Amino acid sequence: MLDPRRVFRKIVSWSLEAKFRASDFFVLAVYGAVVGFGIWHHEPWSDEALPWMIARDTDLRGFFDLIFHNWDRHPGLFHTLLLPFVKLGLPYFTQAVLNGFFALAAAFLFMAKAPFPRIFRYLFLFSYYMLYEYSVITRPYMLAILLLFVIAAFYSKRSERPLMYAVLITLLLHSDYIVFGLAAGLIGAFIFEHRSEIGKNRRLWGPLAIMVLNAAWVFWMGRSLPPSHHEYGQKLIFNIQNITQAIANAFSPFADQVIYSSFILPAALWGGVLILFLVFVSMRKNLPSVLILGSSLSYLIFVFTFLHKGDYRHHGFIFLSVIFTLWITAEPPAAERAGRTLPGWFNARAVAISILSLFLVLGLQNDFFVYQQEYFLPFSGAKDMAHAIRQLEKEHNIFEKGYVVVASHKKSVALMPYLPGVKFWNPCEGDYAPYYVNTKTLAACAELSLYDVILRTRRHFGDLSKVLFLFERPLPIEKDENYEYQKVYAAGAGVFGYMYETFYLYHPQAKSLGYPRRVL
């Protein structure tokens, strides 16, 4: 006969165990299946298109010119990894598959190497950030997370193999600017730990030079926007809400979107502050770890306060900085912990992990919410509209007949990966524009009224009979004194993703010629 108490003790023991067992592969398989489902149903938005377009539509010189001049506001590691896939002519979906591979590799490393209770590792894998934001939406962030976890797993060997450590830090620096503060903290901590050896041990000189020079290079790239870039010279006015929102979002995404947000948002904020306090308390005798977390948080808070207020994908790195620092911070010997009371090292760590676990449990509803949205609704209307344009070409040979697609909004780049060989004409540039080069002119064009777009196009082409207007919103009145504007297709009903990317395709019909049948 089963002893309930014994069964309960076994369940608790299994839940708190920090080892990796063969049975954990089942959870990894479930994680991979869910992420794969999300990737399959996801419609990429304009930001996801940028790395692919930069890799596809530039030669090698142009590619590195765009990266070094920071046009995409991300370092070039992710873009560089895309190059062979793009140049081999593989489909756009390859980018999402690659990101899914990064997610699965990061999940395996976390499950196998992270020194956390099993239940916490499971909850982390199925958090909103790991299950959706970074794994399904393809940006450079998942690559940065994978490198963070590789560094965490390697961290205990940093003194034995400093060159490999320097290579990993360099890759992290070039993965994304969002982790610059964390990488800088890791470099500073390494220097602090080896301060007495640096002058004597030449073996450290090369690795240190690699890390410091790459940090300086990435910092220079990040701050060196071309004057024609649409974000050049932009600064945020100080707003304390940018900081409080970032902390709340880091530990409880969508806290500001629910019915009881007036209660949940402050709870998420103060819960996040308490977690940060407890983590610092738990590391108070480990100065390198304090330096690493402090550097990352200081950098992120500076960015969110003065440069870019960020969104979930940015705020999540506060949460990830905490996870990373807890991972690499070794527990003191049992004898040293003996007799300690709150807020002692082990207790503070345990309480912080417990509160984090509570947030993760409460956040499971976010997974259901976003996956339900992905299944029933489009994240962006770009894929649907691109399919409609391809169908027009297939049925009516519009591009062979000399038709031109006019697009004024920068988010039109979201369609371009699906339309190889097709270029959009921009009324502000007066030419076929590379929509992945976000100039002030291109950004200003997005603010034009739809009638100004039509007017500029008419001035350039004269006859509009072979023009297709790609708008981000419907025309208020679909006619003027010369043309009736036939709505050929509308894409994006129910769009729920970033920027709510909807697209409307119009074909001008000269009034004197009557109205031919609809193309679609």
Each model region followed by its residue ranges:
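Membrane-embedded, lumen/periplasm-facing catalytic core of multi-pass transferases
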Residues: 361-416, 422-430, 520
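Membrane-interface alpha helices of multi-pass inner-membrane proteins
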Residues: 33-35, 130-132, 149-151, 162-188, ...
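Transmembrane signal-anchor helices characteristic of membrane glycosylation enzymes that use polyprenol
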Residues: 20-48, 209-225, 301-302, 364
